[in-house]
Amino acid sequence: GLEGRQPLLPAEGSALGAVNLAAHLTKGGRLDYKRLARTIHTAVHLLDNAIDVSEYADSRQSRLTRATRRIGIGMMGLAEVLRAKGVSYDSEKARKTAQQLAKVIDEQARLASQRLAGRRGPFPLFTESRQNNGAQRRNSAVTATAPNEVLAAICGVTPGISADCAVSAQACVKMQAAVQRYTEGNVYLPIPAKTREQMQELCTMGYLLGCKSIEADVCEPVEIPDFLKDCQPERETQEIAPEKPQSALRQEMPHFCPACGRALRKRQIVPVCEECGPLMCLQTVENMQ
């Protein structure tokens, strides 16, 4: 994940996932914490494996991601848990419930990462990190709540810690702050802010409560000033050289193999080098036609 749920180094990546809380509800509406702990340990193992088997954009991203081994386990289906308990989303009891769940996820994820480090070793940059004075961990970070709308839709639950009904923006910020206390990375929760002024107030509120980020769900469009509308980049006048006929281009451009330097010969459409074989270069094909 590169969307900012985990603070990352340049070109670094992380593996993110979410635990379906609703799947751990018993028939009586209670949470099965033992089963939840097993799920978290499995998730840590899964995401750590994902770091090794994933394909990356380049060698630098692959090297940095495997050096820190950041993962982010979050939650989804919180609204279903609160509804099963008969608790209103905008209540102190709901925030305490969410905070307790975040604490369990964080503690079990740390424990699972420590056990995994005992078998596989800590992340390569452990001795250079701020965690080198504590217990060895397989992953430099273990918890974060990312936007998991797709996963939630597959599981049939509400995404992340979102409510299943309309609630105030202040209630969302308070809920996010409650979960953020026991989350290493960021906690994603879209805030229904309608104006820029309201968004500024919510950002201040979130900062004072300990949130690491505040993201607006809906905000009024900002009018573009006239001086920006009329601003156009100056175009430099350049003289365009007359195009040369195709026959002249064919005579000027020698057709040699870029690998061994031998002359190319054309076989049907694909140019062929006697030493290296066919060359699938479209530009070379077009020039030889």
Regions found by a protein language model. Give the residues of each.
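Long, C-terminal-biased catalytic regions of enzyme "large/alpha" subunits
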Residues: 1-289
